[in-house]
């Protein structure tokens, strides 16, 4: 079910269409094109965040449209009952790309942080022209195990309690952890470009570099940047990167 809501032009004259894809709030940026970039935001973010806006501004100049949407518990969906668990997000990304296949000839993807991880799972067998990843999570099991170590949570305890709230506000879920362990990233045949911050304290450099080497990705390391690209210099680097790879 695809529901159209409204179309308007933002202050920078960019066309934005707000609608829903199977009740998932979405935004389509830019003028009609045969090329679409599906943009998957990161944790604690939303479908109109700054990296996606920069992507839309840059991409529209090169004849791309951008399709972004809110993950569960994010943006317009903060009060929904659906949780932002990996298994739910993979299902939703599958719905999004099926919609894209109906409307565009060339499909590209942009994934930010955990959005890249969900993309790796959901799109691995899809016909994607290129993937663009910013601060990508490529080994979720490692990140969850690190959190369990930090907060003294054993596998046995997590299995028994099913859900554990951590001091940083992030829940640990047994079913999430189990899904991650059962679905490692073992194949990825899509031409991929990565922008990674040298000071990223969430995604360890050696893990990202090993991923890039294993799957023959083009990687650019931003020396002064952290996991969250947000400073004026970070965003300038991001914009320049988009201009170069699109």
Regions found by a protein language model. Name each.
Residues 74-103:
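Catalytic nucleophile-loop/oxyanion-hole region of alpha/beta-hydrolase
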Residues 56-78:
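Conserved alpha/beta-hydrolase
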Residues 111-119:
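Gly/Ala-rich beta-loop-alpha elbow adjacent to hydrolase catalytic centers
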Residues 34-42:
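Short beta-strand element of the alpha/beta-hydrolase
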Residues 109-111, 134:
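Short beta-strand immediately N-terminal to the catalytic nucleophile in serine-hydrolase-like folds
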Residues 3-32:
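N-terminal cap/lid segment of alpha/beta-hydrolase-fold proteins
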Residues 127-210, 214-246:
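The alpha/beta-hydrolase serine catalytic core
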Residues 44-56, 206:
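The serine-hydrolase catalytic nucleophile loop
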